[in-house]
Amino acid sequence: LRSVTTACGNIAIGYMAGQATTNGDNTAIGFCAMHSNTSGEANVAIGLCASRAGTGARHNVAIGFRALDSSNTCGNVAIGYQAAYNQSSGKCNVVIGCQAMYNAAGGCEFVAVGHKAGYSNNADFNTAIGSCALYSNTTGTGNLAVGHCSLYASVTSNNNVAVGDEAIRNNTTGASNVALGA
């Protein structure tokens, strides 16, 4: 909080944590946690460089090394090593897992749980549970992928349900499919 002149209700613990904060009610714990936050408010960033590059994020929780690193949005929860790392415009997402939604710049109301779940997602209203579930999805919406690598290759597919290990793994554009089992 070295540069703070008007903000109130902030907590910063760690070298350069919350350094640029001008709004209030932020908690930054860890080296460079919430380092660039200027106008964001009511955020929690815990971990080395957690929510480091975001400038105007609001109501986010980032726990883990560089979790929610680029976020300027609101209502996101990212827990894990580089979880939601490139998330810059998505909102109301829940991301739990090492590099879950790592390369996803957008996407709203997405749930990703598991190592690299929803890795490239930029779409809305998807649920990916399991390691690499919905890994390649960029614009497909309304998908449910539960299981290791389920809907893995899906890029633009919509409204699919895949439950099981590698269920509908190689589908890239097909829509409205249901697969139960490996």
How would you describe each model-predicted region?
Residues 1-182:
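Glycine- and small/polar-enriched repetitive beta-structure motifs of secreted/surface proteins
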